Amino acid sequence: MTLLWCVVSLYFYGILQSDASERCDDWGLDTMRQIQVFEDEPARIKCPLFEHFLKFNYSTAHSAGLTLIWYWTRQDRDLEEPINFRLPENRISKEKDVLWFRPTLLNDTGNYTCMLRNTTYCSKVAFPLEVVQKDSCFNSPMKLPVHKLYIEYGIQRITCPNVDGYFPSSVKPTITWYMGCYKIQNFNNVIPEGMNLSFLIALISNNGNYTCVVTYPENGRTFHLTRTLTVKVVGSPKNAVPPVIHSPNDHVVYEKEPGEELLIPCTVYFSFLMDSRNEVWWTIDGKKPDDITIDVTINESISHSRTEDETRTQILSIKKVTSEDLKRSYVCHARSAKGEVAKAAKVKQKVPAPRYTVELACGFGATVLLVVILIVVYHVYWLEMVLFYRAHFGTDETILDGKEYDIYVSYARNAEEEEFVLLTLRGVLENEFGYKLCIFDRDSLPGGIVTDETLSFIQKSRRLLVVLSPNYVLQGTQALLELKAGLENMASRGNINVILVQYKAVKETKVKELKRAKTVLTVIKWKGEKSKYPQGRFWKQLQVAMPVKKSPRRSSSDEQGLSYSSLKNV
């Protein structure tokens, strides 16, 4: 029987198609009316012809002898098929201009067509139906309607949508409300009231998806309708203000030189207003940018706050501004349902700063030259500068330090080194500079113990002056004893400094104390005839290493002449 019905339906459908295909008004596929329903739930779909395309209703069409025919195209197929209205329990049925599914299945997804026709008239339209699945939290790919509530505006309600016509008014359904996954029960400011959900005070925390599940009986069966909508809390009209222009303002002046790029932002704040059209635009000399000849580009960006307050920014750009452009009037305008405002930007031509190129170059060159001269002077005369400072501002190190000698001289005991020490060093340091030297062979008493007296002399001296020569590094000499004692005293107590004077070059030595001393201490080199003059670099280096002492130097020309002549004869 079912097979016979299918064959007959296809036969008559083919006849209808062939007769009416050439003269039927086909409105095509109305994608704007895509219908989405949940699987295993009932759905009722009205033919869109009577709602959007035709000027008469179904009753008028039926009275005029027109017949409404339904057929469909399965998903991913091209073949149009008649709808089977003989399924068990009348799962799919038609009632006047409504197509019923009790309930829908996933394979019901496709494009459905309703055709109104008779022998002289034909009109049809198709629309897509999508059956979707939902999870336990009512999540699905379905597009959700958005309902906006005013923040802190008093009691507001939302209503469970799209449930009219599914059951008669005599049936009392059961309605359960959810926020996300959670059943709404004992919420602070949200109260279910049947088909309505009341918000006592809408807050930002109330943003989210709300679902109503409507359960009703029909012919001994129980059906469920699931409807989800998104609640968005927006700014209250009580707090709405006219547009506020943040930029341009009186505090910012756009100064540009001809040829530079001119960028002027117009930033406007709009309070949220339901169905308000927010507009921002520029005028240049009272005209819109499109009505003038200059090359102007305007870029716009829009951002929203959590309560849907809007900030619009339009940036006016002129790539290469001219002197004439900098004299024009640039005004930003804004309009909303609350009013219209305008603000002019302050634009002017930048006055070029005077250029002191030559003066700056000369000043910079003079500064560099002065710095170079100072560096050279310091490098050449740093010894003189140190000695000058010590002579006038230095603190006398010899006061109350308990020392008897300024310098203990350590040297190799042979004729050449002794002559250098006794005549040259002693002559200048004692006679010219006024230092008190301790020379063991001169100042020690006969019969004493050499080791004890050596250590005693070193402890009584402020400096240990070591005269280095090849003979100095011979093992077992008194000179090495003096060196070791001085270095140990300097390292452990710090009350004596060691001065190294190289009288003659010393090759590699196995004396580790001397190796260590030459690594950490500066060596003052004696250069023979070049170093004999008391005002020469050798003696100045030696003076810097000596203790600061406020003792008058011998200044008579006779004594200086004698000393210098004696040095020349050494």
From Swiss-Prot:
Keywords: Cell membrane, Disulfide bond, Glycoprotein, Hydrolase, Immunity, Immunoglobulin domain, Inflammatory response, Innate immunity, Membrane, NAD, Phosphoprotein, Receptor, Repeat, Secreted, Signal, Transmembrane, Transmembrane helix. Pfam families: Ig_6 (PF18452), TIR (PF01582). Detected in liver, skin, placenta, thymus and lung. Isoform 4 is predominantly expressed in brain. Overexpressed on candidate chronic myeloid leukemia (CML) stem cells, hematopoietic stem cells and mononuclear cells of patients with acute myeloid leukemia (AML). Overexpressed in patients with chronic obstructive pulmonary disease (COPD). Expressed in T-helper 1 (Th1) and T-helper 2 (Th2) cell subsets. Residues 21-128, 141-230, 242-348 form the Ig-like C2-type domain. Induction: Isoform 1 is down-regulated by phorbol ester treatment. Isoform 2 is induced by phorbol ester treatment. SMART domains: IG, TIR. Residues 21-367 are extracellular. Residues 389-570 are cytoplasmic. It comes from the Eukaryota. Residues 1-20 form the signal peptide. The keyword Protein transport does not apply. One of its GO terms (cellular component) is cell surface. This is Interleukin-1 receptor accessory protein. It comes from Homo sapiens. The gene is IL1RAP.
